[in-house]
Amino acid sequence: MKQRTIKRPVEAIGIGLHKGVPVKLRLEPMAEDSGIVFYRSDKGVSIPLSPDYVVDTKMATVIGNEGVMVSTIEHLMSAIYAFGIDNLRIIVDNDEVPIMDGSAISFVMMIEEAGIKELEAPKKFIKITKEVEIKDGDKFAKLKPNEKISFDFEINFDHPVIGNQKYMFNFSTKNYIEEIARARTFGFLKEVQYLRSIGLALGGSLENAIVLDDKKILNDSLRFEDEFVRHKILDAIGDMSLLGGNFIGSYEAFASGHHLNHLLTKELVAQEAFEIVTFEKEGEKAVAKAFS
């Protein structure tokens, strides 16, 4: 299997979730072994995709370099991971990736419009070689060895619409588009009101998030009955992309979020619990077929 980029540049305009201002997003092809790099065109600063450049994980995954940041990268990175893209320049003219409809489907459509280009160099996978786990009370996130890529997530909210939800996702690009990409981010009305009081979530609305009061959702409907846990998987895929490539293994979590996911990527690297592998022949392994 070869490294991938996109065939041609593609652009979109949306608003940032927290500042509520317009953001122009542009994806550009890059050569093999370039990796994925964010570029703030308004500041002239590049930020490589790496756990070492994560600067905040409270409300979203935020990366930064030289005091310049790009926030809410996880939905875009989730879609990029799903297509197995290794080399890409991501240009934004503000400090947030646009939220679009709160899911990853707009980014999936951008990538499909741009097309996938295979390069000459072999694709490098991050193969998990031993179990790594991060805990915080009853919350946890772990990566385990497996010959395939899978995500197993459970959440438990004291809310009549959410409650306990579990989802086991066997990864492939096709499955991602059908099962995960359309799942939207969600938040509680009382939290949104507080965030706005401190100047955050100014771009949030029923157009780009599921909003819940104490008893129900305020949106017209859900896209999936278990849309909440599916979105947590969408986020986890985006957060795991900060490893710098597609991993081979199983991700399992209970009530994890951006912070635990980030600590998990850092711990995996610290323990050297992985090896870099390449598959020279297409279809040689089940994991290569997942990206076909």
UniProtKB/Swiss-Prot annotation:
Cited Pfam families: LpxC (PF03331)
The entry's keywords: Hydrolase, Lipid A biosynthesis, Lipid biosynthesis, Lipid metabolism, Metal-binding, Zinc
Coiled-coil residue windows: none
Active site, renumbered: 258 (proton donor)
Pathway note: Glycolipid biosynthesis; lipid IV(A) biosynthesis; lipid IV(A) from (3R)-3-hydroxytetradecanoyl-[acyl-carrier-protein] and UDP-N-acetyl-alpha-D-glucosamine: step 2/6
Cofactor(s) essential for the protein: Zn(2+)
Gene Ontology MF annotations: metal ion binding; UDP-3-O-acyl-N-acetylglucosamine deacetylase activity
HAMAP family according to UniProt: LpxC
Protein name: UDP-3-O-acyl-N-acetylglucosamine deacetylase
Organism: Nautilia profundicola (strain ATCC BAA-1463 / DSM 18972 / AmH)
Organism lineage: Bacteria, Pseudomonadati, Campylobacterota, Epsilonproteobacteria, Nautiliales
The gene coding this protein: lpxC
